[in-house]
Amino acid sequence: MFITRWLFSTNHKDIGTLYLLFGAWSGLIGACLSILMRMELTQPGSLLGSDQIFNVLVTAHAFIMIFFMVMPIMIGGFGNWLIPLMIGAPDMAFPRMNNMSFWLLPPALLLLLSSSYVEAGAGTGWTVYPPLSGNLVHSGPSVDLAIFSLHLAGASSILGAINFITTCINMKPKSMPMFNMPLFVWSVLITAIMLLLALPVLAAAITMLLTDRNLNTSFFDPCGGGDPVLFQHLFWFFGHPEVYILILPGFGIISSIITFYTGKKNTFGYTSMIWAMMSIAILGFVVWAHHMFTVGLDIDSRAYFTAATMIIAIPTGIKVFGWLATLAGGQIKWQTPIYWALGFIFLFTVGGMTGIILANSSLDIVLHDTYYVVAHFHYVLSMGAVFAIMGGLTHWFPLFTGYTLNQTMTKTQFWVMFVGVNMTFFPQHFLGLSGMPRRYSDFPDAFTLWNTMSSIGSTISMVAVLMSLFIVWEALTCKREVQMPLGKKTHVEWFFGSPPPYHTHTEPSFMLNNTYAPIRNLISYMEWPWPEK
């Protein structure tokens, strides 16, 4: 029974739970790697004893956090659990393919960890640039294992993307227009389309790297007429859409949370929010070379990529102001998820500001590969994506389990995490502006103060992570049942109880004349019997 339920599962709720648990476990590994890096960088001088080991930590931390934490939790976990509930589908379109999408991930993680255990490990950074990743500099099977790991994780994501696209378009009720789907469903649909377009390019790039290393081709070797810059173009054509893939489902989660806890019928500017996400997705594919301002692009290329990158700020700003307008005039219920959502808006906007600065090709010449860049993308990932994940977990935990979290503990954990991540990454702006380069295991004494502060902040963040584990354990142990507020009647995933039955529907829902929108207008929002805690 256990094996048939969890290994051969075709149930979207069980597979979503597997994704969430796997993502949490991987996230702990990634967090431990980051703590090791911050220990090395707390003071000048060597702690780990080898620059190669440090670079292996950097590489593994990035891969684990991106491919085995954020994507499985946001797309695999929340996507699987919520999308069938939100569109009234019995399950995902391809349930067995869904299961395979998940079970490709543990072997991929195993391959990635193995790459660190053999020879010297893959110390290339997550960008895997040749010639550093070539077989002269990284001899031995480490990089090959990392490449195979990426192949498996990529195959998993592509299969999942096909599944989500088919589900969102084909399995909603015939009378529900696309523009009546919840924003979270839209965000995952757009994310899946981006995955489907971006990942094959990465697969091509790393396959060429694999043959360069093992079959004596010279795609990226100038001696044979290749060009290492070609790899950078291929990699970043995947890599830039990837960072939007990481944040878009977070946008959907934040939209759900803010609409829910402000007691609004709908997010402000619902269609504009969808168009903004579409614009971000399209623009995300045409700005990749802003990661390459220092490799010697033409002046006109630099002008174009600077301008195009700045244009992405417009739809992003539309989303931020959409959230603020949703908050405006709402009867805000101050439960933990709205804390995470407000933290997301503030810190994601700060990260966006530094992104605008880095978009200037002239400034980026100086700031490229410094800690300024690290601070920028950790503000949008460590305080954007992760805050969205934490908000989603605290919001939907009662739906997934049927038990409520302790509000006092979750709020305390939010503040500890908030202080920790800001203390970790804000000083890194100063380090970058002072010229401290990324991916180095040691630094001049002049940088000691901010590095020490950053490391203290990372310890605080780690305490917050451990608190979150305790909070989940406490909720599952105390078993406080959920009392459903009527306010959830506009959020269709809550219709079926907490937790919903194992099989929510036996067939796709039927909806006459699009009853979805009018029902929203009939419900009064001023008299919600909210529970106190």
Curated annotation (Swiss-Prot):
Catalytic activity: 4 Fe(II)-[cytochrome c] + O2 + 8 H(+)(in) = 4 Fe(III)-[cytochrome c] + 2 H2O + 4 H(+)(out)
Annotated positions binding heme a3: H376
Disulfide bonds: none
Cofactor(s) it depends on: heme; Cu cation
GO annotations of cellular component type: mitochondrial inner membrane; respiratory chain complex IV
Record's cofactor remark: Binds 2 heme A groups non-covalently per subunit.
EC number: 7.1.1.9
Membrane topology term: Multi-pass membrane protein
Transmembrane segments: 12-40, 51-86, 95-117, 141-170, 183-212, 228-261, 270-286, 299-327, 336-357, 371-400, 407-433, 447-478
Gene3D superfamilies membership: Cytochrome c oxidase-like, subunit I domain (1.20.210.10)
GO biological process: electron transport coupled proton transport; mitochondrial electron transport, cytochrome c to oxygen
Record-listed Mg(2+) binding positions: H368, D369
Spans within the Mitochondrial intermembrane topological domain: 41-50, 118-140, 213-227, 287-298, 358-370, 434-446
Subcellular location as annotated: Mitochondrion inner membrane
Recorded GO MF terms: cytochrome-c oxidase activity; heme binding; metal ion binding
Residues reported to bind Na(+): E40, G45, S441
Entry binding sites for Cu cation: H240, H290, H291
Positions contributing to O2 binding: Y244
All ranges on the Mitochondrial matrix side of the membrane: 1-11, 87-94, 171-182, 262-269, 328-335, 401-406, 479-533
InterPro entries: Cyt_c_oxase-like_su1_dom, Cyt_c_oxase-like_su1_sf, Cyt_C_Oxase_1, Cyt_c_Oxase_su1_BS, Cyt_c_oxase_su1_dom
Pathway: Energy metabolism; oxidative phosphorylation
Major location category of this protein: mitochondrion
Assembly information from the UniProt record: Component of the cytochrome c oxidase (complex IV, CIV), a multisubunit enzyme composed of 14 subunits. The complex is composed of a catalytic core of 3 subunits MT-CO1, MT-CO2 and MT-CO3, encoded in the mitochondrial DNA, and 11 supernumerary subunits COX4I, COX5A, COX5B, COX6A, COX6B, COX6C, COX7A, COX7B, COX7C, COX8 and NDUFA4, which are encoded in the nuclear genome.
UniProt-listed PANTHER family: CYTOCHROME C OXIDASE SUBUNIT 1
Protein purpose: Component of the cytochrome c oxidase, the last enzyme in the mitochondrial electron transport chain which drives oxidative phosphorylation. The respiratory chain contains 3 multisubunit complexes succinate dehydrogenase (complex II, CII), ubiquinol-cytochrome c oxidoreductase (cytochrome b-c1 complex, complex III, CIII) and cytochrome c oxidase (complex IV, CIV), that cooperate to transfer electrons derived from NADH and succinate to molecular oxygen, creating an electrochemical gradient over the inner membrane that drives transmembrane transport and the ATP synthase.
Name this polypeptide is given: Cytochrome c oxidase subunit 1
The organism of origin for this protein: Lycodon semicarinatus
Gene name of this polypeptide: MT-CO1
